[in-house]
Each structure stands twice: as C-alpha cells, then as structure tokens.
Regions:
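Carbohydrate transferase catalytic cores enriched for Leloir-type hexosyltransferases
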Residues: 1-350
C-alpha cells in the first residue's frame, strides 16, 4: 500500500501572508515529485489544493475545535504514515509527525501579540516542537531559538529555507502610473511596523516618491492613514490591502525599492521576492532578516525612521549594485529545493 502523508493546509485561502505562501508553494512543488507517496492536504479550501495532491476538505468555524476535535478524529480515520503540521500538533496526536515552526516571535518579543494569542502560542508551539518527530524551521535563527528557548534537541531540527516563486522576475507587467513608489509588503500590524515606513517617508521631504502598502489590514490600517494625514501625505500613501499573486509580482517590478520595516521576522519572504524581481531592498536588522538578506540589502535599525529614510536614499543611489547582488542572493533559494528537502524529512520517518 502506498504510504499516506497528510499535510495540514489550513492556511490556504486565509490571507495569512507568509504562512499561506509557504503551504501553497510547498504543495505546488510536492505535486508530482513523489509518485511513491500518497500526498494529501487537509484544508477548509479544497479548491485551492493543486493537482497532484489529494484534497481533503475539513470545514471548521473555530481553530480550537478544529485542532482539538475535528482534525484528531480525521487523522484517526486516515491513519497516515506521516503527518505535517504548521506550528502545532493537534490534541492527542502521537503518530510520526513533522511540525514547521516559522518563528518564535511570541517568545522573542511577545508585546506584539494579544494576550490571548501569546498564551495560545506559548502553550502549544514549544510543547508541539518537543513532541514532534521532526521540526522543520525556515532559518538558522529559529533553530537557535527552538534549542535555547523551547528546549528542542538540535538533532530533531531540520533547517529548510523558503523559496522564491518563478513569477517574481523582472519580466512581465508592471504596476506604475509614472509616479515612483517604494513598496511595503506585509500585513498592517504592529510587528510589521508600517508607521515607521510612513515616518521615514515624511523625513524624505517633498519629493514625489510614494509609499504603497500591499497586505491585509490586521489592525494598523487606521493608524497608517492617520499618520499619513498628520504629515500631509494622503496623496503619497496608498493601502492596497491583500493583493493577488500576479498583482504583487507587478507591484514589485514597478517599485523603486522594497521597504521592509519589520520589528521581528523568522524569515522575510518579501526580501527574496523583491531581489528576484530586480528591486533594491531596505530592511531592518530584526530577527532573521540579516541572515536572509545575505549582504544584498541595505539594513537599518528597527523602529528608527531617520535610519530608514537614509536607507531608502542609499538604495535609490546604489540601485545597480543592489539589484545585481539581489539577483545573486535570490538564486540561492527555490521552492523546488524546499520541497525536495521536505520530502527527505518525510522519508526519514516512513
């Protein structure tokens, strides 16, 4: 009988930015790569599962009910040889398991999370990582955090970096109307620090550079609009909300630079997406961003609008060098490699 590997794909269709991108791109690359395995994805949105992966629908209104009752019941029925989860194991699951942990921001700086989320993540993620057969992390930083903050044995942790989708390249449509813009990619929330981006734009003075935000509003949209109004920048700050893959690729191509002011990141996919698109990157020295940038970006201190404004000026002035360095860096990451290394983890447990 063909071994069954079940992948929890609950992030699909939920606009969970980096987590959804990880699951979607991993499934796309896994499809067709392992004819010796039966790969199945459990999700609320089976229509988003790519061909080559078996889609198993699991409607759920509440995450707690899903993880404590519905998913355990389904897994008892399916009896997979390996099950792959994001962040946490479902209640009572004891079969061979893989957990991907994207970051430990809830331990590194919990002030960016609500009290409820802080309690949930601190209760479930470290415990799940210690119980899992293998833990996949996307950066060396998260590996160090799991060892030091969660007590996970190093020999059970496998670093498998994220990749860059082929749609991110200089070739293709651009989003521009002749007015230059810096692009900010990510949800509007405190940890991503969109307000520092607006403050940095204000410090650049009365030029024509705009700031375009692409990502869902997770609570800071109103504050961003208020900051723009306070500085008289209403016509130079645009909030696009969640955008499609194709629109995001076009936004990268048309941008003068990527601005990534985050206070903490376990990886930082937009850095590589911008680099692959031929766009200079200005990012903070926060979390894993220096590790992922690999010397191919302008790095500034988080929460410092003065440094951010200076970084933008340097990126625009040194565009040619940064674009060339970015291409070299982005070529070191691919979702195909992510899938192959993930399959190797599955096969260790069969």
């Amino acid at each position: 009988m063909t071994p069954l590997v079940v992948i929890d794909a609950d992030a699909l269709g939920r606009q969970r930015t980096g987590n959804e991108t990880y699951v979607r791109e991993l499934l796309r690359e896994l499809a067709g790569r392992a004819p010796d395995l039966r790969l199945a994805a459990v999700t609320r949105h089976p229509e988003l599962v790519p061909d080559g992966i078996e889609a198993i629908g699991l409607p759920a209104r509440h995450q707690l009910v899903r993880m404590s009752l519905q998913l355990p019941r389904l897994l008892r029925k399916l009896r997979p040889r390996v099950a792959h989860f994001q962040h946490a194991l479902p209640l009572g699951y004891s079969g061979p398991s893989v957990v991907t942990v994207h970051d430990l921001s809830f331990e590194r700086d919990p002030s960016f999370m609500s009290l409820r989320d802080r309690v949930v993540f601190r209760t479930t993620v470290p415990r799940s990582a210690r119980r899992a057969s293998r833990v996949i992390v996307v950066s060396e930083l998260t590996k160090r955090d799991l060892i030091g903050l969660a007590g996970v044995p190093a020999e059970r942790i496998v670093v498998v970096p994220n990749g860059v989708a082929e749609r991110f390249s200089p070739e293709g449509p651009q989003t521009t109307n002749g007015r230059p813009y810096a692009l900010v990619v990510g949800s509007l929330e405190r940890r991503k620090d969109p307000l520092t981006a607006v403050e940095g734009l204000a410090l650049l003075g009365g030029g024509d550079l705009r700031l375009v935000f692409a990502g869902p509003d997770r609570g800071d949209g109103g504050a961003v609009r208020a900051a723009a109004a306070r500085h008289g920048l209403q016509q130079r700050v645009e909030l696009k909300g969640h955008v499609s893959d194709d629109e995001l690729a076009a936004l990268y191509r048309g941008a003068e630079c990527l601005v990534f002011p985050s206070r903490d990141e376990g990886f930082g996919l937009p850095l590589l997406e911008a680099m692959a698109s031929g766009v200079p990157v200005v990012a903070t020295r926060a979390g894993a961003l220096p590790e992922i940038a690999g010397g191919a970006a302008i790095l500034v201190e988080p929460g410092n609008p003065v440094e951010l404004a200076g970084g933008i000026e340097r990126a625009l002035a040194d565009r040619e060098r940064l674009v060339a360095a970015g291409f070299d860096r982005a070529r070191q990451f691919s979702w195909a490699e992510t899938a192959e290394r993930t399959l190797a983890v599955y096969r260790e447990l069969l």
